[in-house]
Amino acid sequence: MKSKIRIRAIAFRAACGLFAALVFITPALAQRRERLIDTWKPVHYDVAISLNDQLTEIDMARTEISVEVLAPNVSKIGLDFGEMTVDSVSVSGQPARFERSPEMLNVTLARAAQAGDKFSIVVNYHGRPKDGLIFANDRDSKPSATGDNWPNRVHQWIPCFDHPSAKATVSFTVTAPARDVVVANGKLLTMTRNGADLTVWRFEETKPIPPYCMVIAVNEGAKLDASEKTVTPLSYYVPQKDRAYAPKGFSPAASALAFFNETIAPYPYEKLALIIGATRFGGMENSSAIVFTSTLFDSRGNEKMSKRFGIPARTEDVVAHEIAHQWFGDSVTESTWADLWLSEGFATYFAGLFIEKYDGEEAFRDYLRNAAERCFNYEKQRNTPIHDTETQDLMRLLNENNYQKGAWVLHMLRKRLGDEAFFRGLRIYYKAHAEANATTEDLRDALEKASGQNLHDFFTRWIYGSGHPIYEVSSASMELGRAGGFLTITLKQTQSGDAFLDPVPIEITSGSEKKRIVIRPEGKIATERVRIGGGHPSIEIDPDGTLLKELAASRKS
């Protein structure tokens, strides 16, 4: 997902631009809660929604939740639900008692359910949700309705278990004005007229997805099918104002689908719809139905361009980022909010890999340099771990730790393990957790299996610890003559906190001779004695940019 500042954290453009702009929402909606799937889990949501003609509210809605019980003697089911008016609740076809509390709908079962029991809960309701489903005019000044759920706002318009670990399949039946086009997760099953003024659209997503990715989008726009041959049906849903430019603006999409399909695994969903809609984010990775901000295609004057696609680099980045999420974030979803980097860090890095392939190595280096600067600046404000279990406002997790630093962690792992082991490990990880959830330790296990390396210390320092190394080099020449001699290199880490134990590549240039060594720190000070040729030596730390680090002023003794 890409966000813009007003809530979702930092605007990030240029080659590493990750965020787009948000509108402030109330802190309560962003409050952290790690709901445990302990007594029951949702299996499927069947959501039927009838919108009024002006697309300003829900006239009627019916959500049926298929439930599986996981514990003995369960007498109540607690659904996350906002402030919409509840008309009735039933369990397996029988009226049921329910109670409202802030953000909850508690349903009392007629008899205690036991582990393994399966039943359905139906909630009938109506009204205008205060969040989650955005009613707004689009770029053509026409009414629209768009789901926009991250992190935990889908319950404002769909009663559900609103946590990323509670994945389920979903179907949508949307009754909308006949003038409008509707898109939702999954495959379009039917589209039928209901009288002269209404059309009923039915979609079904057969793969379990996180609740924040369950979406509908309704507006009086255009549907355009991509002209390229793609691994899955690819289409664009845009206001008429964007109709001419959309094929060019979305031109990276077909290549991104092919690249990620080859690099990770086959595309996981039945289609891919790219939608220009009313979202608070620069892009929101809803499974098979990505929504992009209405300003995605706006000109911003003299900005960096993609060499391959001839569009702004920020547009290329956000399109690739959101498509990468279809694998990482949507198919493999973070188990807890502390594991968010498994979604955002992955999407950030894979967007960078896409840039590396299609715009070249220098563009990729630029991307990583910009990402590193964002990390350093962020740490001056908040020096917290990537795996953050403390921050209570979920919007504050949309930060450089989970995006750029997460991407850098993956890059360092790639360079440490080598491409073959790194990508094999990611494929092992993806295969094991596709259509499910994963933790940081699941990723470590997969990479260790692929590489044969023990990555405990790396993950402990980079994921569960904070900060980054700041290196300083001092050198002392010994017995140096025309025929050469020895150079003693002392590598110090000057950052606060514990040492980083990553191997550090060093390049030494002495006269016409270049030599590379690797220093393997065991603490904050490491020393290496190196034979060198004649001439005054110069030293470069990490010449290929494989480490997230800063350099303190070097000195000679």
Task: Go through the PLM ranges and name each one.
Residues 81-141, 195-197, 202, 523-535:
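A surface-exposed beta-strand-loop module
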Residues 85-92, 455-456, 469-542:
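Beta-strand-rich binding/interaction modules
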Residues 266-268, 399-489:
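Amphipathic alpha-helical substructures
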